Regions:
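Conserved N-terminal beta1-alpha1 strand-loop-helix module at the mouth
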Residues: 1-59, 65-71, 79-82, 126, ...
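Conserved, mostly hydrophobic/aromatic
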Residues: 9, 33, 60, 85, ...
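Conserved anion-binding
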Residues: 2-7, 65-148, 160
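Short beta->alpha connector loops
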Residues: 13-16, 38-41, 90-93, 145-149, ...
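Short, acidic/turn-prone active-site loops that include or flank metal/cofactor-
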Residues: 62-65, 90-91, 112-115, 167-171, ...
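A C-terminal functional module that forms or caps the active site or interfaces directly
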Residues: 138, 145-192
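C-terminal helical cap(s) of enzyme catalytic domains, especially alpha/beta-barrels
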Residues: 99, 176-219
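Alpha-helix-loop-beta-strand connector modules within alpha/beta enzyme cores
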Residues: 41, 45-61, 101-112, 152-168, ...
């Protein structure tokens, strides 16, 4: 996945026509399209193949099963031309390593989620999950744009591995804060696909991200 705009569009929709239209409209401002269960359960894995003809696709399946099942899931992801897959870290090193070993692209481990409930159960083990992601050879981690101070800490743990940061827009995160904190990519969904002009909104967000990336780092 080549970094141009730092924007990943979360296609959290169920209609194939809407997903393909959004992808075509925003592709000039998006580095990858993230698909989740709502779209795939509605349209099947064929939608991943179709989106992959427009741009890079990350399957946000938050894979969370035993090692053998994880291998089977990850194999299917890459058979359908995705470039990456998101997996949960709490399942343990052996199960995450199975995903990495089966992958023919990038594996991103969820270190900490962006919703409020994650602060209760997820955050206390998040640092350990980030360390594990490095140890098993994952391409990077997922860390919350809603808590940029956590992104800053995760950067010290994962070094030059990628950080994907969801929660920009509807959840309250800004495009600039996670980038300044060290995120490589921001993940945005509703703020773009619910906008009157998704292409214009995507352009605006990438401009904000670019300004943040160019600014001197905060200490």
């Amino acid at each position: 996945m080549r970094r141009r705009t730092r924007l990943i569009l979360a296609l959290d929709v169920t209609e194939e026509s809407k997903a393909l239209r959004l992808a075509a409209d925003t592709k000039d401002y998006v580095d990858a399209f993230k698909v989740n269960y709502p779209l795939v359960l509605s349209r099947g894995m064929g939608i991943v193949d179709k989106l992959a003809k427009i741009g890079d696709v990350i399957c946000d399946f938050k894979v969370a099963d035993i090692p053998n099942t994880n291998r089977l899931i990850v194999d299917q992801v890459f058979r359908h031309h995705a470039k990456g897959v998101i997996v949960h870290g709490f399942i343990g090193e052996d199960a995450v390593k199975a995903c990495v070993d089966a992958a023919r692209g990038d594996v991103f481990v969820v270190a900490e989620m962006s919703h409020p409930g994650a602060e209760t159960w997820n955050a206390p083990i998040a640092d350990d999950l980030a360390h594990m992601a490095v140890e098993v050879g994952a391409a990077g981690i997922v860390a919350p744009a809603t808590r940029p101070e956590r992104v800053r800490l995760f950067r010290t743990i994962v070094g030059d591995r990628l950080i994907l940061s969801p929660g920009v827009g509807a959840q309250g995160g800004t495009p600039a804060d996670p980038i300044r904190a060290g995120a490589d990519y921001i993940i945005v969904g509703r703020a773009i696909y619910d906008a009157a002009n998704p292409r214009a909104e995507a352009e605006k967000i990438t401009q904000e991200a670019a300004r943040a990336a160019a600014a001197p780092p905060r200490r």
